[in-house]
From Swiss-Prot:
It is found in: Nucleus. It comes from the Eukaryota. InterPro entries: Snail/Krueppel_Znf (IPR050527), Znf_C2H2_sf (IPR036236), Znf_C2H2_type (IPR013087). Transmembrane segments: none annotated. It comes from Oryzias latipes. This is Escargot/snail protein homolog. GO terms for molecular function: DNA binding; zinc ion binding. SUPFAM superfamilies: beta-beta-alpha zinc fingers.
Length: 46
């Protein structure tokens, strides 16, 4: 049973989140964005 609301909804897949920053992180799955990179090997990560 959920006791909190999920006001932030992904416009692409409809998945709902309780916090805006969780939705923002989720959108990288759809966009393919990888904003974090390793300083040692230069690989990018989501």
């Amino acid at each position: 049973i959920r006791t909190h609301t999920l006001p932030c909804k992904c416009p692409i897949c409809g998945k709902a989140f309780s916090r805006p920053w969780l939705l923002q992180g989720h959108t990288t799955h759809h966009t393919g964005e990888k904003p974090f990179s390793c300083q040692h090997c230069n690989r990018a990560f989501a």
